[in-house]
Amino acid sequence: MSTLKIDDQNEIYYEYVEPKGDGHTFVFVNALTGSTAAWNGVIGNRITEDGNGFLAYNFRGQDNSKFNEELNLDTDLIVSDLCLLIEKLKFKNIILVGLSIGGLYASLALEKGVKSNGLVLINTLRKNNSRLKWINETMVNVARYGGTSLLMDMNMPVIASPSFLDKMKPNALNTVSYTHIRAHETVMNRGWRLLR
């Protein structure tokens, strides 16, 4: 567990397992609601059993990755961070693996010059349409208002099994973790006091 420091307000959290010999490094690119936890366990263990390694990392704004709140966490920034991470850690013999929109980010990293021996797309949509644009814009708005915790809580019933939801419930649906809402309430409360 490490971080790549970009500056005093920005850093990228990552977990790296080195491959053996000529093994590949699988670079896992999260979904918007993802985290390194999605890749550890079954997936990570299976890859390392074959002598390969992996890099799992969190985008700025996801768990343990700090970011300047004035930054626009958009596609260009996320793809640039992926390229920077691969360059700084000097990975060779990589295979990019993108989950959901992470597949788009991995594809765009290839367009920016990242050298990869393969590209694996998991649940990545091929065509943008009105429905997908609506969902993506809503997800961004939810993240802006309540942070990634609220975004995760909104999406879990759609992407997880009922038994998994039951296991997650004690650590989910906790409004204390909706950071942006608290900041908004603080500003609103201060504003109302000024009007009294």
Regions found by a protein language model. Name each.
Residues M1-E11:
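N-terminal cap/lid segment of alpha/beta-hydrolase-fold proteins
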Residues S107-E111, N117-G146:
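Flexible "cap/lid" loop of the alpha/beta hydrolase fold
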Residues G98, G102:
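Gly/Ala-rich beta-loop-alpha elbow adjacent to hydrolase catalytic centers
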Residues N10-F67:
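Conserved HGGG/HGGXW glycine-rich cap/lid loop of the alpha/beta-hydrolase fold
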Residues V142, D153-D166, S177-Y178:
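Helix-loop "lid/cap" segments that line or gate small-molecule binding pockets
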Residues G53-V97:
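Active-site loop/oxyanion-hole signature of alpha/beta-hydrolase fold enzymes
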Residues T179-T186:
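Conserved small/polar residues in nucleotide/adenosyl-binding loops
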Residues G191-R196:
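Hydrophobic alpha-helical segments, chiefly the membrane-spanning helices
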